[in-house]
């Protein structure tokens, strides 16, 4: 182990404690390969200790007055704002995305804390003073208990902040299993929450992999699981946790289609598609994966997309004006290369080859923006979630065909349309099978105050993340009917 590189600790019961396991994994900077830290691959015993701490803390936290919980969240929001630049830099270091994108991610996370700080309003019930003569009835919200969260590498700030601030604001306690690929930001979030006055045991962090995940899914004292990650794992999480009697929300894979109509403003469409396809190295559930070009606009659209992709600066996300950083690991880079080779083999036309960019030949896990034209729905690159800076272009003649292509995918996280025609927008809105829709913009981004998630194989569960769906997920209701 490299001298001077720290091994991260778990956060259990308000204390930083070493894992019972001696096994660790390196956390490299994806842009350089430099090891930033080592993360413990914790055991079921570590997880059990965290759940026990959360269960004990729930006894008092669930009874803490809601306004006091809100004041702690307000203080937490202030601390996050004060440390905004530090947090953004940490995201770039361990994830690789550009500093500008990381800065925006911190904003999204802070917005989630701001929403959660409205707990006194969010936790309000309802009353009807007279359901019959002399009888009144009311609904009251209560926390559900210990909640488990399992988060991915691609948004180490935003996704955890979808989960634990709102769960905690509602009176629950929380055990977070962050991605072992980006664990450092999670620890910093816990430090700042403690500084804000959060009592010990309300938030716990256990680093690790399969043992910790399975422990959360199976532990009888964990009442709910929130998950964001790949489709196969999300389906497993949903089925396993549900089989153990837990409430589950699992946000999973995507293959988002962007439909470009003949009347579209091409300047806007190209700008938005480039940002959506290649921002965060394509490693996001709302990335534009497929462009469906309608009618005779296709040739010019492809030409403009390639020209714009050629202007993208690739490199270390901490460098000024860098737009496209590395993918998360060398193995993911090779997986992307394999998909590019497969796309060529299956007959798609490679109009921009990201393997040839200069940055790909140096240190770090870089792959340049890659664009395929004349992709068809029987090709693997159309079917699979590649999760990398690879864009496929499908050509069709009508909006009906474009909608048919998009709806054919088993994924249904999001879709966008570029048009100036309100009739096109209405048809798109009503007929597309997806949860997050955009018009003349590339990423219909999650907002703290509205529900966020997809349909079909992009989501398992009933209640989505964020907004009042999130409040519903983290609370249960009691009805009181009284005669006086």
Swiss-Prot record:
Signal peptide: none annotated. NAD(+) binds at residues 153, 177, 180-181, 230, 252, 385. Homotetramer. It catalyses: 3-oxopropanoate + NAD(+) + CoA + H2O = hydrogencarbonate + acetyl-CoA + NADH + H(+); 2-methyl-3-oxopropanoate + NAD(+) + CoA + H2O = propanoyl-CoA + hydrogencarbonate + NADH + H(+). Keywords: NAD, Oxidoreductase. The keyword Methyltransferase does not apply. It comes from Geobacillus thermodenitrificans (strain NG80-2). Catalyzes the oxidation of malonate semialdehyde (MSA) and methylmalonate semialdehyde (MMSA) into acetyl-CoA and propanoyl-CoA, respectively. Is involved in a myo-inositol catabolic pathway. Bicarbonate, and not CO2, is the end-product of the enzymatic reaction. Coiled coil: none annotated. The keyword NAD applies. It is an enzyme of class 1 (oxidoreductase). This is Malonate-semialdehyde dehydrogenase 1. SUPFAM superfamilies: ALDH-like (SSF53720). Pathway: Polyol metabolism; myo-inositol degradation into acetyl-CoA; acetyl-CoA from myo-inositol: step 7/7. The active site is at residue 285. It comes from the Bacteria. Belongs to the aldehyde dehydrogenase family. IolA subfamily. Transmembrane segments: none annotated. InterPro entries: Ald_DH/histidinol_DH (IPR016161), Ald_DH_C (IPR016163), Ald_DH_CS_CYS (IPR016160), Ald_DH_N (IPR016162), Aldehyde_DH_dom (IPR015590), MeMal-semiAld_DH (IPR010061), MSDH_GmP_bac (IPR023510). Its EC number is 1.2.1.27.
